[in-house]
Amino acid sequence: MKISDIPFVTTDWSTVPPERHAGDSGEAIWRVQYFGPEENRIRVRMVEYSPGYSADHWCSKGHIILCLEGEMETTLADGRVMPLRAGMSYQVADGAEAHRSATKAGAKLFIVD
């Protein structure tokens, strides 16, 4: 990720329209903003997983994820399970370990990719 051509800007996440994304179970509500030029666009999201959410796909995209509330587990393709609780983050590169997330009680995340 190269951060360039982004002027100083603030985001009031409560004004960003929600997008609903169904999981294998539960849903994820995304509030999304894009920054920077098209060829190097950075996606910034506030994401809320409902209780019982389980992702419907394996992801190979790189992310920086900060858990703001709740907790979730991310399962890696090799079988490892990584817990993420409020105040914790994880970082993974594009094309690195495929991962898939789930939560029992729900979680609120701040994600940059």
Name each model feature, range by range.
Residues 1-43:
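A short, N-terminal "cap"/entry segment at the start of jelly-roll beta-barrel domains
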Residues 40-59, 93-96:
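Conserved short histidine dyad/triad with adjacent acidic residue
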Residues 49, 58-74:
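Short, conserved beta-strand element in jelly-roll/cupin
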Residues 56-57, 74-75, 92, 97-104:
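Short beta-strand His + acidic residue motifs that chelate non-heme Fe in jelly-roll/DSBH
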Residues 78-95:
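Short acidic-glycine-tyrosine-enriched beta hairpin
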Residues 89-92, 104-113:
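A short hydrophobic beta-strand segment most commonly corresponding to one strand
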